[in-house]
Every structure is written in C-alpha cells, then in structure tokens.
C-alpha cells in the first residue's frame, strides 16, 4: 500500500496533525474533497504540511481592506517553503464606524466570536500551522485567544498602520483628530470648510488608524510577546516592508511547524509582563488591559490587574504617540520602531525578560540587539528625559471601583495629579452625549456613565464620542469622565473606564447620585466617592434590579455569560457554568 493508504492515526511516529484528515484508506472521501478545492493537486501534496491562513479581510474596515492581497503574498510564500495554504476568513467590526450607536455594543463581543470561529475551523480541519493575518481592535486579541486554545504552531503578521493625514493647516492628523474636530466645529472653533476638508483627509490610506490606538497597541505588543516579527506594529500597510514581513513570517511559520513550536511555548507569564511593560513605555490603549487579561485566561495564566499596576510603577513612559502627541506610528517606525524601545527597556536591566524565545527562533534580546534609537525626541532614553518615570496606564482602586478601574495616565495633561469634582450621572452613553451637546456639562463636573459595562451595555461600548467632545470643547483638563464602559485608544483626558464591579452587577458606581464628590488621585492610583458607608448601604437597599436589555440574538446569550472587565470581559467557562 502507498503511504496515503497505510496511515495509522494512533501511530507513535505521527508527524503531521493534518494526516488525520488526509491519510489512510478511510480518508479517501476527504481526499476527494481536498482535490476539489484546487489547493491540492496530487498525492505528493497530501504529504505536505497543511497551513491555515486565518484572514480578516473586510471591505468596510480600512485596516483590513488590503488583507486579501497580503494573504496572497502569504500563500505564495507558504507554497515556496513547502506547505499547502488554505485561507479562511473571520468577521470584523470597525470601531470607528460602529462608534456611538448600537453597533458599538457588538465590538468587544466580536472578539469572542472571532476566537470561537477561528478555533472551530483550525480544530475541525487539523491544520499543522496557522498564519494569522489580523490588524484592528478586537480581531487581533480574538485571534491570539484562538491560537492559545488550539495551540498549533502559529505566527502573526498584522496588516500595518495607515499613513497620518493632514488638517487644513498641514499638520499631521489621525482619526482622533477627526473625532475632536466634531466638538471643535460644534463650538465654533472650526469652519465648515475646514471641517469637511479634514474629514476627507484624516485617513488617507488603508491600514489601522495612525495613532497609538487599540489596533496598533496590540500589534506592537505582539512583537514583545514574541509571536510577531520585529516592526510588525509600525511598518506601514502600504509599504514593501509590510510585504517582506509577510514573506518572512511564512518562512518562520514553516520552521516552527517542523520544530513544533507552539503559542503556549511563547506566551508565558513573563511574555505578558513584557507586553504590559511595552504598553507602559508607549502609552498604549486602555483596551490592552482587557485583552491581556483575556489572553492570560486562554493561556491558563493567573494574571491580575494588580500585576499591571506593579509594572506601571517601574516602567518609564518613553514614546508619547497620538492621540497624546503629534507623532504617528510612521514617526515611531522611522525613529527606530518597537525594537528600539524594547532595546532601551532591556538597557534598564530589570524591566523585561529578554532571553525568552520568539517566532524568529531567536531570543527577544537577539531580535533587537542591533536596533538603536534614531530620533530621541520621538523615542526618549530612560535615563535622560522620559516623559514620566512611570508608565502610561494606571489601575485605580477605591470605594468606587473595589475591583479596579483603568486610566490612560499618559493621555492626561502632566499638570494634573488629582481631580476632585461633582458627579453628574447618566445611565447610558446617549444620555451623556445629549447633555454635552446641549451645554449641560461644565468645568468641575465628573460625568458618570454607567450601565455600559460588559453585561450592562451589553458589550462595554467605547466612549470616544463623549471624551472627544469634551476635549474638542476645550474642557479636557476641567471635566472628568468615569464609566463602567471603556474607551477607544484614541481617547484622552481625565477618563476612567472599566470600573469594576459594573453597575449591572450592583457595583458602587450604581449608587452614585448627582452632586456627590469624587476624587481621582493619579499619584496614589485611587478613586474615591465621598459618601460614607452607611449612606451607600441605604442607597443599595433602594437600588432597582438590573433588567437585561437584549432579549434575542446572540447578544442576549453574551449578556448572560460575560464576566467583569477586571477579568478581561471573557465569557464564563465550564467551571462557572457547571460547578462540581
């Protein structure tokens, strides 16, 4: 018999996972179907590794509209390296387009759908390796979660960031500039002509949005985690360098398949610590906290927000990127990129774990050894002039957030060390937006936007509209916003999100009333509601039970199963659903 007929799935010398679907006489029907795909031409092809390309090509997402072409580059590189590529696609949500309406409630939940769907295709077809091609917001963490569930040799190459746009004065812009322009236009600070010109030029190319928003935060973090190649987070989407990364990634994947290097070999507790250290150094999106916690959950790693706070205390803020400065991702790339930042952190001596292995087959230290800072205005040295001696994110605890909350400290004006204001309470984002638009918000207010958490929203929508409007109106240093929802990576200002427990879980944020005083202390990482425990207990007695908003569709199931932000907003697992 030929090798194809004599395959034994129980053999000790099993070499390829995909042999389960293509070898042995009983798999003849499967082989017929494989020939019908056109990807397999002859029995010799059946002996080659089967490689999945998990793409996320979606035409309504500018960060993904070019991924069909990049997948073709990856497929050819896999064939050249001796594999058989099979492309499949996942869904995707564009957070910028979905912002401020029902669509935003589907954004964070889409992460779970992406993880589930990728896990399904990869597991059902016994692929030998997976080339993940993500780019924006929830797609990247969803794919990482799937890779950990399947634990098959995997490499990640993102689609890359877009070029920065230009405003009417010729200054570089990103999507956050456009959101803030809405507030400026409404306040009479921008003419209609300027507004329309900016609208058409803020996002000039395909790629993820040009600042250090969620997409680029996650794509840079993958570099230091060791699951993506150097410069994955900064090489432009439209560049030849991006295509070279695709080709190199395919070659590395084929090596990893041969050596059986798997995601759980690379994504360790130390890798997650290093991811958050880089996030602190670059002032990344607050959403990275949610996603790193969810990645830890899938990897079976005990990880807590308190761990993140400890990292924040010792890692300096080295590269301030839009929306916190004028610099875009292409500027960071030209200044030395993420490898230069990693190298600077390694130079500190006790911040990273540089001897971990990565997808290159080399250690993190070896990957970045030759990469120095080229422009020390964009990437600063830790011992010369860091933006701050502590990282760009902070976890705040207190009686308003017993299980924690998150603020992008690097997006707050450096002159602000603490803020005390008077609560003005809204039970939805829409109510808050209407109040802002009608001029009800003034200096000294702390906007409370609640019942917008993972369960309450449902879906934990981003509050980019309210934060951008506040900034655009010139109140970014005089008004704070506190929510059990979350923020876009494009948000800045005194914006505290992820308040846990959320209002829908009877968290203290549900007890806040108009006029209550609230103090946000960035130095001591606390947030305090100035109401005594007796009064809070009395308010709790009169608190009305939360009524779920969704009664049909998959979001109703999501609302029933989702956990709190302090655990990453993942869905309840078997241990919680079926306790022993």
Swiss-Prot record:
Pathway per the UniProt entry: Amino-acid biosynthesis; L-isoleucine biosynthesis; L-isoleucine from 2-oxobutanoate: step 3/4; Amino-acid biosynthesis; L-valine biosynthesis; L-valine from pyruvate: step 3/4
Lineage: Bacteria, Bacillati, Bacillota, Bacilli, Lactobacillales
Residue sites binding Mg(2+) per the record: 95, 137-138, 462
Record PTM N6-carboxylysine, positions in chain: 138
Cofactor dependence: [2Fe-2S] cluster; Mg(2+)
Pfam families associated with the record: ILV_EDD_C, ILVD_EDD_N
InterPro entries from the UniProt entry: Dihydro-acid_dehy_C, DihydroxyA_deHydtase, DiOHA_6PGluconate_deHydtase_CS, ILV_EDD_C, ILV_EDD_N, IlvD/EDD_N
UniProt xrefs under NCBIfam families: ilvD, PRK00911.1
Enzyme class of the recorded protein, top EC level: lyase
Ion transport keyword on record: no
Cofactor annotation comment: Binds 1 [2Fe-2S] cluster per subunit. This cluster acts as a Lewis acid cofactor.
Active site: residue positions: 488 (proton acceptor)
Listed name of the protein: Dihydroxy-acid dehydratase
Domain of life: Bacteria
GO biological process: isoleucine biosynthetic process; L-valine biosynthetic process
């Amino acid at each position: 018999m030929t090798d194809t007929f004599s395959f034994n799935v129980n053999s000790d010398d099993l070499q390829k996972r995909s042999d389960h679907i293509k070898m042995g006489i009983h798999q003849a029907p499967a082989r017929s179907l494989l020939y019908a795909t056109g990807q397999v031409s002859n029995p010799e092809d059946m002996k080659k590794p089967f490689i999945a390309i998990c793409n996320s090509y979606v035409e309504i997402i500018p960060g993904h509209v070019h991924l069909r072409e990049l997948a073709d580059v990856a497929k050819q590189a896999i064939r050249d390296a001796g594999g058989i590529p099979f492309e499949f696609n996942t869904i995707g949500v564009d957070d910028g387009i979905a912002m401020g309406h029902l669509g935003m409630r589907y954004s964070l939940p889409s992460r779970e759908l992406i993880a589930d769907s990728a896990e399904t295709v990869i597991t059902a077809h016994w692929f030998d390796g997976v080339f993940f091609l993500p780019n924006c917001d929830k797609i990247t963490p969803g794919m990482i979660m799937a890779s950990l569930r399947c634990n098959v040799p995997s490499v990640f190459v993102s689609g890359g960031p877009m070029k920065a746009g230009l405003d009417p004065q010729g200054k570089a812009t990103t999507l956050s500039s456009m959101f803030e322009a809405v507030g400026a236009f409404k306040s009479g600070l921008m003419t209609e002509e300027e507004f329309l010109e900016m609208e058409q030029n803020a996002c000039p190319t395909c790629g993820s949005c040009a600042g250090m928003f969620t997409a680029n935060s996650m794509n840079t973090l993958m570099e230091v985690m060791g699951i993506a190649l150097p410069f994955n987070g900064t090489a432009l989407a439209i560049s030849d360098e991006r295509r070279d990364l695709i080709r190199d990634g395919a070659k590395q994947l084929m090596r990893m398949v041969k050596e059986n290097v798997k995601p759980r070999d690379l994504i360790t507790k130390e890798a997650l610590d290093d991811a958050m250290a880089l996030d602190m150094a670059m002032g990344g999106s607050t959403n990275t906290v949610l996603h790193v916690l969810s990645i830890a959950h899938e990897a079976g790693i005990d990880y807590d927000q308190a761990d993140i706070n400890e990292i924040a205390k010792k890692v300096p803020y080295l590269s301030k990127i839009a929306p916190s400065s004028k610099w875009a991702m292409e500027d960071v790339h030209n200044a030395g990129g993420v490898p230069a930042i990693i190298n600077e952190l390694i130079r500190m001596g006790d911040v990273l774990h540089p001897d971990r292995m990565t997808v290159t087959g080399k250690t993190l230290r070896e990957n970045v050894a030759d990469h120095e800072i080229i422009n020390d205005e964009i990437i600063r040295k830790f011992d010369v002039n860091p933006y701050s001696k502590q990282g760009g994110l902070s976890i705040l605890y207190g009686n308003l957030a017993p299980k924690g909350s998150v603020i992008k400290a690097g997006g707050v004006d450096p002159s602000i060390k603490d803020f005390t204001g008077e609560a003005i309470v809204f039970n939805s984002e829409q109510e808050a937006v209407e109040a802002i638009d009608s001029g009800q918000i003034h200096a000294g207010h702390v906007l409370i936007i609640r019942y917008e958490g993972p369960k309450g929203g449902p879906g934990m929508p981003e509050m980019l509209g309210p934060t951008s409007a506040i900034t655009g109106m010139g109140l970014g240093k005089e008004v704070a916003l506190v929510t059990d929802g979350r923020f876009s990576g494009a948000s800045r200002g005194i914006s505290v999100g992820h308040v846990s427990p959320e209002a829908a879980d009877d968290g203290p944020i549900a007890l806040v009333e108009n006029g209550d005083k609230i103090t946000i202390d960035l130095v001591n990482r606390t947030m305090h509601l100035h109401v005594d425990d007796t009064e809070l207990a009395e308010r709790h007695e009169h608190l009305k039970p939360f009524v779920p908003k969704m009664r049909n569709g998959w979001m109703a199931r999501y609302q029933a199963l989702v956990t709190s932000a302090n655990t990453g907003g993942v869905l309840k697992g078997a241990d919680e659903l079926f306790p022993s």
